[in-house]
């Protein structure tokens, strides 16, 4: 059985990891052993934060809608409840955009929500 030398495979694996660690600080971008740990940790952070991003954007949208609806005299929860009663189905992402960029339209939505709450 011939002897198998694994230099080519090892070099390729090391290059792959060091390429992924490019731009990291200090030994994390130069030393294979440290770079492996850094790349694994970065992958864990990326996996976690892809999920957190969805939560954080929803929080941002709610904060923006709340601020805009309070300027029009209605709390966030009552505003959303009013929209549901008025059977206006606009998601929070679009509501937040309207609240920031088109205050007149948002004010009319708040008025419709108020009307639905008083009925």
From Swiss-Prot:
HAMAP family in UniProt: Ribosomal_bL20
Family: Belongs to the bacterial ribosomal protein bL20 family.
Keywords: Ribonucleoprotein, Ribosomal protein, RNA-binding, rRNA-binding
Name the record gives this protein: Large ribosomal subunit protein bL20
Natural source organism: Shewanella amazonensis (strain ATCC BAA-1098 / SB2B)
Pfam families: Ribosomal_L20
Function: Binds directly to 23S ribosomal RNA and is necessary for the in vitro assembly process of the 50S ribosomal subunit. It is not involved in the protein synthesizing functions of that subunit.
GO CC annotations, alphabetized: ribonucleoprotein complex; ribosome
Source taxonomy: Bacteria, Pseudomonadati, Pseudomonadota, Gammaproteobacteria, Alteromonadales
Any one Gene Ontology molecular-function term assigned to this protein's record: structural constituent of ribosome
Entry annotated with the keyword Repeat: no
GO terms of biological process kind: ribosomal large subunit assembly; translation
Keyword hit for rRNA-binding: yes
CDD domains referenced in this protein's UniProt entry, alphabetically: Ribosomal_L20
């Amino acid at each position: 059985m011939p002897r198998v030398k694994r230099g080519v495979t090892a070099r390729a694996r090391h290059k792959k990891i060091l390429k992924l660690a490019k731009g990291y600080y200090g030994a994390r971008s130069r030393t294979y052993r440290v770079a492996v740990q850094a790349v694994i940790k970065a992958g864990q952070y990326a996996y976690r934060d892809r999920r957190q991003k969805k939560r954080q954007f929803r929080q941002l949208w709610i904060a923006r809608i709340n601020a805009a609806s309070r300027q029009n005299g209605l709390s966030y929860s009552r505003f959303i409840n009013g929209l549901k009663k008025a059977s206006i189905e606009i998601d929070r992402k679009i509501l937040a955009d309207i609240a920031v960029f088109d205050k007149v339209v948002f004010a009319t939505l708040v008025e419709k929500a108020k009307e639905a709450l008083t009925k």
